[in-house]
């Protein structure tokens, strides 16, 4: 969903970046068919800036890989999440639209990203588990 929205916004002239915040299970790179040179570990451990780890995709969109299959990203501590948020805020001045694609659930990182966002789009499917999980997230907002 986030990739399709990003591509359509780019076609309409917006400068868009997608931040794949489904840590360790990131799939934006899979959807785009692009293997990024960098992922969030490079920001956290290798002193790369957020802008340095952006990979260019089709239609001019940028994306930041959450690291597909990188188990260390699945268990980020609060300090790492705060670092990501402080770097993410800088992108707001470089892009018209910053899309944060989080994983399902009510983890600390999901809540941090939801609370910092001026607008939230909650994707729900007609499956009972999706409806229940989405309602649970809405209740804690």
Name these PLM-found stretches:
Residues 2, 77-80, 130, 134:
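Short, conserved glycine- and acidic-residue-centered signature motifs
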Residues 18-93:
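P-loop/Walker-type NTP enzyme "switch/lid" segment
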Residues 14, 95-96:
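Short, high-confidence coil segments that cap the C-terminus of an alpha-helix
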Residues 1-22:
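Walker A/P-loop phosphate-binding motif and the immediately C-terminal alpha-helix
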Residues 97, 102-141:
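Conserved catalytic-core segment of NTP-binding enzymes
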């Amino acid at each position: 969903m986030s990739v399709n929205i990003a591509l359509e916004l780019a076609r309409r002239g917006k400068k868009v970046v997608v931040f794949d915040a489904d840590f360790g299970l990131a799939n934006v790179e899979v959807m785009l068919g692009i293997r990024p040179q960098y992922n969030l570990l490079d920001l956290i451990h290798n002193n790369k800036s957020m802008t340095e780890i952006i990979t260019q995709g089709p239609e001019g969109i940028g994306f930041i890989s959450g690291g597909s299959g990188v188990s260390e990203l699945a268990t980020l501590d609060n300090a790492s999440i705060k670092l990501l948020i402080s770097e993410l805020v800088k992108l707001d001045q470089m892009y018209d639209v910053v899309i944060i694609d989080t994983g399902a659930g009510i983890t600390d990182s999901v809540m941090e990203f939801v609370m910092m966002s001026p607008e939230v789009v909650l994707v729900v499917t007609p499956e009972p588990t999706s409806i229940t999980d989405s309602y649970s997230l809405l209740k804690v907002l």
